[in-house]
């Protein structure tokens, strides 16, 4: 599918989000459902923000090859290349299933933990892909168009920048400005990390499943520590570009270096930790 990149860039700049229809192929959608069926129903949410009736599977990129291709999708890469610096990173990769009876999530923005003034140049760009169709009844994402343009003063009126989410009073006020992002299964919403949104209330009798890949500037700390989270034997099989997105890369001049060498060397089967090797060479003993 050929993407009208300029159209989607303009939509993100104006409204804070855009939707790519038919993002997943039929084969990708079927494989995604197959893989997620193995993991879901075993990862209950831990708090009201995650959702006590919401299931989340983190580090999705490590769990099946289908997610490698989706993370690297050329249409998403084109948008990231426009809004983010070269060497941008994958910051989060997770599945989200909102089960029947789940309450609406608190309003929030995905990168509120970067304590930088608003409005601001893009620090992160998020995607959410519908595995099940998003409807008003089953928990479609609620979003506030153009809220990525709000300054800190406007955010402070209804939204807690300090905590990254609104309280019940703030959520009630924001709800009047929000719209539901209904979209068919296989569609992808791409949005600014500062867009205020939330997972919707599931009033249906069926779960609503989605997954979210998020990308960030190369100088920003990633939400997920993929270097530790993705087994090295899995990471070593990934395409070089995906390895770079996980953090096996260097942002000039030397952000991300591994003991003064390139971190991708750690994926080689014969890799020896340089600190260990240097200590052995000089007869030094490392801390125990």
Annotate each PLM feature.
Residues 195-196, 200-288:
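Non-heme Fe(II)/2-oxoglutarate
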Residues 1-15, 20-118:
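Non-heme Fe(II)-dependent double-stranded beta-helix
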Residues 134-200:
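Double-stranded beta-helix
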Residues 86, 100, 113-121, 130-140, ...:
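Active-site region of the double-stranded beta-helix
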Residues 25-26, 96-98, 112, 134-136, ...:
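Short, solvent-exposed loop/turn segments at secondary-structure junctions
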Residues 53, 107-112, 158-175, 207, ...:
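Short, surface-exposed loop/helix-turn segments at secondary-structure junctions
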Residues 103, 107-110, 117-118, 137-143, ...:
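A short secondary-structure junction signal
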């Amino acid at each position: 599918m050929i993407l009208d990149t300029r159209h989607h860039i303009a939509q993100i700049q104006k409204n804070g989000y855009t939707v790519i229809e038919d993002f997943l192929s039929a084969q990708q959608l079927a494989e995604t459902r197959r893989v997620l069926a193995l993991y879901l129903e075993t990862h209950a949410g831990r708090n009201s923000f995650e959702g006590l009736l919401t299931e989340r599977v983190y580090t999705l990129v490590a769990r099946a090859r289908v997610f490698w291709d989706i993370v690297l999708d050329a249409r998403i890469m084109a948008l990231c290349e426009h809004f983010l610096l070269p060497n941008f990173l994958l910051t989060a990769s997770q599945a989200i299933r909102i089960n029947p009876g789940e309450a609406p999530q608190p309003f929030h923005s995905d990168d509120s933990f970067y304590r930088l003034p608003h409005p601001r140049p893009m620090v992160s760009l998020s995607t959410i892909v519908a595995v099940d169709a998003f409807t008003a009844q089953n928990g479609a994402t609620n979003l506030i168009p153009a809220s990525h343009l709000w300054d800190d003063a406007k955010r402070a009126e209804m939204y807690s920048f300090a905590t990254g989410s609104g309280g019940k009073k703030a959520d009630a006020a924001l709800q009047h400005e929000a719209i539901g992002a209904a979209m068919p299964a296989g569609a992808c919403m791409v949005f600014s990390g500062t867009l205020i949104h939330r997972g919707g209330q599931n009033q249906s009798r069926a779960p609503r499943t989605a997954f979210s890949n998020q990308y960030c500037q190369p100088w920003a700390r990633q939400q997920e520590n993929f270097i530790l989270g993705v087994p090295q034997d899995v990471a070593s099989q990934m395409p070089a570009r995906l390895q770079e997105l996980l953090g096996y890369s260097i942002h000039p001049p030397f952000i991300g270096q591994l003991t003064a060498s390139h971190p991708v060397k750690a994926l080689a089967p014969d890799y020896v930790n340089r600190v260990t090797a240097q200590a052995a060479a000089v007869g030094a003993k490392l801390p125990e």
